Structure formats: C-alpha cells, structure tokens
Amino acid sequence: MKTKELVIMALFAAIGAALHSIIPPFLGGMKPDMMLIMMFMGILLFPRVQNVLVIGIVTGIISALTTAFPAGQIPNIIDKPVSAFLFFSLFLLFRKSRKTGAAAVLTVIGTILSGIVFLSSALLIVGLPGGFAALFAAVVLPAAVLNTISMIIIYPIVQTILRRSSFMEAAK
C-alpha cells in the first residue's frame, strides 16, 4: 500500500463524510449514502485487496459516526466492508473497462447491494422503522440513481486530475 494511495483515499473518505453529514434523513431516519460514491471511487482507482479493506473499514466507521438511522452504527460497520468487497468483486469482472459507463453500472449495482446489506443487517440486529420493501423503494433506489449520476459527473473529473498530476501512476 502506497502513501499516495492512502492520502487520496483519505481525501475521498473526508469528502464522503462531508457529503454524508449534509444529506438530510428521510423516511425513518434513512438517507442516501453519498459515502458510497467515494468508497467506490477509491476502489476503482486503487483496486487492491488491502486498499479495499482499508477504505471499507474507514467508511464504515465514519458512516456509523454520522448515521441518522436509529441504532444504525452496527449495520453501517457491517455494510461498508461487505459492500466494498462485493463492489471489488464486480470490478474484477469488468476490469478491462475503466470508462465512466462501467463505473456508473458498477455504482448502481454496488449501491443496491449496499442497501440490501444495510437493511438486512439492520433488520436482523435492531429492526427497521418501516418495511424492508418500503425502505428499499424509498431510500435505496433513489440513492442508487443519485449515486450513479454523481459518479458519472465526478469520476471523469477525478481521472483527469489524477492523469494531470503525478498521482496517475498510483491510480493504475
């Protein structure tokens, strides 16, 4: 694991924490998880197992600290590392394509998987303030759309910045 990679992933985690904090909760304390975009970006740019583990754990802890979901700390800590490795597995299937379209498809699938993991773990550990299907439809699906649109906008910008800087070697 390189220091450059850690620094960039730390920046992604910080940006994700800021986004996660400012998005207001709705429907039983649930809110779209903007932290996922930054976690996914870290995985797309630095696809190594140790990086996936680090960014998954860090985003899980930060999400747990900033959650608006009642007793959502443990489900967040479970969700992020599991989702990080699921996303990484999907990435390995589509490794040849580093295009924005592939990132968008991976983001929508990753967000939906993350929502399923979070809601399932919350259901088993603390219960849900509403039905699984209602929360999935009202929070996870809109979050998948929002995250995908955000990834389509942000990912090419980050790639351009890294390409123009000395960090692009770290992102290969």
Swiss-Prot record:
Annotated keywords? Amino-acid transport, Cell membrane, Membrane, Transmembrane, Transmembrane helix, Transport
Domain of life the protein comes from = Bacteria
- Expression triggers: Its translation is regulated by tryptophan-activated RNA-binding regulatory protein (TRAP).
Q: Name a GO CC annotation attached to this entry.
A: plasma membrane
BP-aspect Gene Ontology terms: amino acid transport
| Chief place of localization | membrane
Annotated protein name in UniProt: Probable tryptophan transport protein
Q: Which organism is it from?
A: Bacillus subtilis (strain 168)
